[in-house]
Amino acid sequence: MKIEASTIKEIQLFKYYRLIRKWACKTYDIKEADLELLLYLDCEDKFTRDDFIKGMHIYSWDKSRWDRLRKAGWIDVWRQRNRTSRKYTIYKTSFKSKQLILRIYRILLGEEDVPSSERNVFYKNKTYTDKVMNTAMERMKNDPTR
């Protein structure tokens, strides 16, 4: 299925991408570069550590990114190496990361709203940035074109 550029513009897919990305990163305690790398790896489906390193070239260098994503449960082992016939371990994005990515897609498409409960990290209004994000989220929710 091929999507035209005019279709993406028509549905305003990326109108609130930055806001949704910031919300996801703060809510799920993940860095923006890590989230975007997970989006890339999710499109790859299954990948090796070498594929991960190749995908990481366009992001800022972070030596501990692999370990951090593995320990936090964003990347799972799909097939373990056995040193004879399987020369390397194959990984995949975890259920946790797939659910986050699907939620981001649903919010971008307007099928779901960003949660606005008191438990939301932005609604604690600790910093000026949180207040600005709250205002932007309210504008996004009330946008009739969304």
Annotate each predicted stretch with a short phrase.
Residues 116-146:
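Terminal interaction helix/tail motif
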Residues 95-128:
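Short, amphipathic alpha-helical interaction segments positioned at domain boundaries
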Residues 4-36:
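Short alpha-helical segments that sit at the start of domains
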Residues 43-56:
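Short acidic, hydrophobic short linear motifs in intrinsically disordered regions
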Residues 57-72:
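Short amphipathic alpha-helical interaction segments
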Residues 70-83:
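A short, conserved structural fragment
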Residues 27-31, 80-106:
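Short, cationic-aromatic polyanion-contact patches
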Residues 54-59, 81:
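A short, basic/aromatic helix-end/turn motif that makes direct DNA contacts
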